[in-house]
């Protein structure tokens, strides 16, 4: 494993080679000065020890090198991790920086948007404050103008209000303050009524009155909320349009805290805006007054009863209560559409000497009124809530209609009320107010009708669009349904067509199969006849062929029998010739050459003839004769080429050996001693094929006489016997030995022991 590990780094093989080339000889050369022998001659144990030490050293080197490589690799990995960590931290810092910059930009954008919004709000507030300031200035200017217009009568007022400052309201304020009970609710109501009177005086008495200064005195100290002079009475409801601005509540809050400016502030601007402010205030009063059934408690204080022939105002709490509920008098807080109801509260002209009586009557009425305050205790809270909100338009219209009817009734009764001294003037004022209310109502009704018509048209348009959308959706749904039905019908038709085609195809296939079956049934007898005829022909051909083969085999057997007989005769002749040559060595060489020629030629001819006639494979009594002949034929040329036997002699392989044996058996008469010493044994086919190597003929060299060869024939026979080995059957005595026995032994060597040898008869 260590060697493999070192090889993994590519360094183990190199030190090992160098150590084998250089280190080992050096270690051996250290003990002696000169190396006298080769390294191969060192002791075996020493060499193994050196090899193990070298292997350990190399393994140690490989381990060290591997550890170094691992350490270097770990160092590289650590450095790579450190670089990756630094890069990651850098990327995170960059990302956080970008996120922080983006957040700062968003904060800046948000701050800029917020600053713009605040700037717009500040501008809007400044615009509203400026508008409120201008409205307040106009209101203050109107108040100053009113106070200056009422300045002379206030200086010598009969009610004992001499020496009041500019900011003090008209005499009704004093009266209300002196007659109210000390409880907090009543005080608040009285204060509101006082402010209402102040604002009403501001809005109605801004213009100077050239006539009747005593009348002005009486009106300033009376409880009448609004009075009209004969010349200025129709000036109030000139403009039917009224302004619904948010300045009313602010004026109510700031009116008491603002002080009047000097006389220099009253100029052309105050005079120019006087009439516009008057019209606006009056119309606002007409709009909102009807929504408050009970406004303040100051209205009964302003009703005075006069003694003598002057008609007195009724001081009944019930009457005053109904009057306050039906006709509120505070134009600042409630702004009634028909302030004062001049028809109902009209009073005759009062003289200056009746003022003390009026005060006494007021004190009496205040005492009587204290009993009614308990019943109206829940009133201030509802009044305060109603004073701070703008009432709905439709409620104002209904209440306006109701007050109009009451005004007509009061006019029919002919009760004198304060505010004007002329009944015709009051009728004109009432008619003008009714006309304005009717015009306003008609205008509102027209606007309502237009709005309703517009709403109706919008609803109809929406309904028409919805109907069109519904129709469109229905049409689309109908088209989709028709398309779906059409697709289903097409699909159904296609399926039916496919089914019909499949049925036709199946029917056609069934018909074709039926026709084919019928055709096959018709052709079946003919095929059977043809097959029978063919079988018969084949049988006849086979029989003819068998007869031919049998005939051929018979002829071949006959030829083979003739060939065997001829070969036997030829062998016998050759053996005789060989035996003669061995006995008679004094025969001339010429005669010896001619005799083998004459003995061999017939055998060669017979072999050639047999070769042409005998087939490739023919079996006679278990012997493959064709193979034997062919084997003998092929073995002879391989062993004895033509250049050796140029004298015309051809060796016949095992035939020569058999002839020699036969010759010896036939020559028993001449040399019985040699024959008796020979043991003839059956040999196998392979031994017969190899016998020519030891035959006596192989010892004969062409062109050399037999006497020069010496006694080679006897030696050849001895060698042959040694090669073939001892006999495998018991020896026969010389008395029983005959030619027939020898032939029989030879034939049995070629055949198997269990087969009969029909060739024995020929021997």
From Swiss-Prot:
Q: Where is this region: Disordered?
A: 1-63, 96-124, 149-268, 300-540
Task: State where the protein is found.
Answer: Cytoplasm, Cytoskeleton, Microtubule organizing center, Centrosome; Midbody; Cytoplasm, Cytoskeleton; Cell projection, Neuron projection
Instruction: List, as start-end ranges, the regions of compositional bias called Polar residues.
Output: 192-206
Query: Quick check: keyword Cytoplasm in the entry?
Result: yes
Where is composition skewed (Basic and acidic residues) in this entry? 52-63, 355-371, 385-400, 430-540
Q: Name one Pfam family in it.
A: MAP7
**Which superkingdom, per the lineage?**
Eukaryota
Q: Which residues form a coiled coil?
A: 54-147
* Database matches in InterPro entries: MAP7_domain-containing, MAP7_fam
Keyword entries, A-Z: Cell projection, Coiled coil, Cytoplasm, Cytoskeleton
Any single GO CC term annotated in Swiss-Prot or TrEMBL for this entry: midbody
Bias class Gly residues marks the residues at 1-11
Q: Name one GO molecular function term.
A: microtubule binding
Q: Name one GO biological process term.
A: microtubule cytoskeleton organization
Quaternary structure and partners: Interacts (via N-terminus) with microtubules; facilitates microtubule stabilization. Interacts with kinesin-1 family members, KIF5A, KIF5B and KIF5C.
Family per UniProt?
Belongs to the MAP7 family.
Outline what the protein does.
Answer: Microtubule-stabilizing protein involved in the control of cell motility and neurite outgrowth. Acts as a critical cofactor for kinesin transport; in the proximal axon regulates kinesin-1 family members, KIF5A, KIF5B and KIF5C recruitment to microtubules and contributes to kinesin-1-mediated transport in the axons.
Question: What name has this protein been given in UniProt?
Answer: MAP7 domain-containing protein 2
Q: Which organism is it from?
A: Pongo abelii
